[in-house]
Amino acid sequence: MSLRYALLGLLADRPYSGWQLLKHFEGSLAYAWPALHSQIYPELARLREAGLIEQTGEGPRGAKEYSLTPSGREQIERWLRETTPGRNTRDEALLRVFFLWLLDPDEAAAYLDREAEFQRRLLADLERIAASPGPDDARERSYRLALDFGLRVTRTRRDWAEDSARAVRAHSPEAPQPRRNRRA
């Protein structure tokens, strides 16, 4: 459902072709809500059928260009005002950590090292984005808030992965121990 609102939000800025929207999902939105070509185009068709967007012309290379309708604008504004975001995020990296006990400690630590390295690279990308100036307008301020969130989460994940790898290697009692009888 959030792909719908990501598309509506992008189209609230200006008309885009499907290809241009895909580039946003491969770029700035990749950190928050990645989406594939195979997801974007069917959702655009559903949005058009629902009267939330309309085809307004042709973009580069003859691609269909879409614009937000007044109903689409109302829908995204209502979503921003009224919807409580779901907190059930899927995190494959964390799911794997849950089962690291199946590996020997060296393999488990190596996995955590790779996770820490991934977070370091992601952090470098985000810091590079943060260092580039943008206009002082409401849109940029919103982008910067999301970027700040990404920076903080990425630093925390990097630190956690580094600390966890060290703890696993040392067979340290500081390594988080699973509690028995966990509630689902």
Where are these regions (language model features)?
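Heptad-repeat amphipathic alpha-helical coiled-coil interaction surface used
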Residues: 109, 116, 123, 130, ...
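Secondary-structure edge/capping motif, primarily at the C-terminal ends of alpha-helices
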Residues: 101, 130-137, 168, 172
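Long amphipathic alpha-helical coiled-coil segments
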Residues: 167-184
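Amphipathic alpha-helical coiled-coil segments and their boundaries
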Residues: 105, 112, 140-143, 147, ...
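Basic helix-turn-helix/winged-helix DNA-binding cores
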Residues: 1-89
